Amino acid sequence: APLHLPEWPERVNGGRFLERVRVLKGLLGEGDHLVLFPEVSLLERFLAHFPGATPYHGGLSGPVRERFFRRPRGVVFATYGGLLLPFTPRSLVVVEEGSESYKLPSGSRAFVPPLAELRARLLGVPLTYLSLVPAVEVLERKGFALPVPKPRLLLVDLRRERGFPVTGRALALLRQVEERGRQAVVLSARKGYSALLLCQDCGFRPMCPDCALPLRYHREGKGALVCHQCGHREDPPLLCPRCGSPLLAPKGPGVDWIREALAERLSLPVYRYAGDGKDDLTPLLEGRPGVVVGTTALLRGPRLPDLALVLLPLADGFLLESDFRAAERYHRLLWALTELRPGRRPLLVLQTFTPEHPVHRALEAGEVEAYLWQEKAQREALNYPPRV
């Protein structure tokens, strides 16, 4: 049933997926409405609950898109191309406005949500942002926060646990999945090897003195630490500057490394799912046990029906990207992972050198917005967008 809010909101966040579906039903009344999605996979998940809506995206044939473009009407579920449809909707809704997929794949550097806001303003129609985790840029908009179930979370401190890329504790949980005939997902930040210099004893990582972003390790020559934001360079230290440990080395297992390590330790079938190659997951979709090792492409893939465990062997690989939005993206990723299985939340296991990071603390507390306000304040202090 539709969930009707007392007044038209500028943003709605939180809740379970089906609650956000109910909110969207409450926002879409009679007449024409435009709903924008970052990806076709998410569009299709919502579309299953809106039989009267019409999809409009690049995955459709040219003749189908052309025919609808000439006479757009009704409730339209679209990717970014929907902004060009020649009609005046009664309202415009942007779903998951913080998604990186809203960045247009061209040299324009355009970002869809601000364009949607401009279109709504020019047409004089209301606009609502609907997402599990709000973008920092829309935090100050008036709206509603739906209650979010507390995640099932286990933080594994890599400064104390042994075993890499999978610790003994995580391996024991994977073997439980194996014994019970369930399914697991193992997520890596990269297809190959990342270049994050981390101390295995204290978790120290070199940061840029100017940008407060992690320095990336480049192997060429004698090696160098480079800031991908401003170009700052420095020599990598031989010992950890914080604790003096010699265990300072590049870390970051890629998909293939993790897959090989698990295949040696488990009798379950281990599948690969990344942007550059995807195994056939049909056996898993039929309910058979197994493990999928992949990148964030898994979030756009099919939902596994018996998913019990989601493991990030090096969660810091997502957190320490050389981009000031990395922590916000990581925060959004973790909450998205809690919804990988419809109806029941899987156990989320994070192997990390920084279990005390504010993103992890917010997830433990079940707080979606509190961390984002901290992030907003930090960006303002550094004059990062949306401050500039």
Model-based region annotation:
Residues 2-74, 78-388:
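Inter-lobe coupling/hinge segments of SF2-like helicase ATPases
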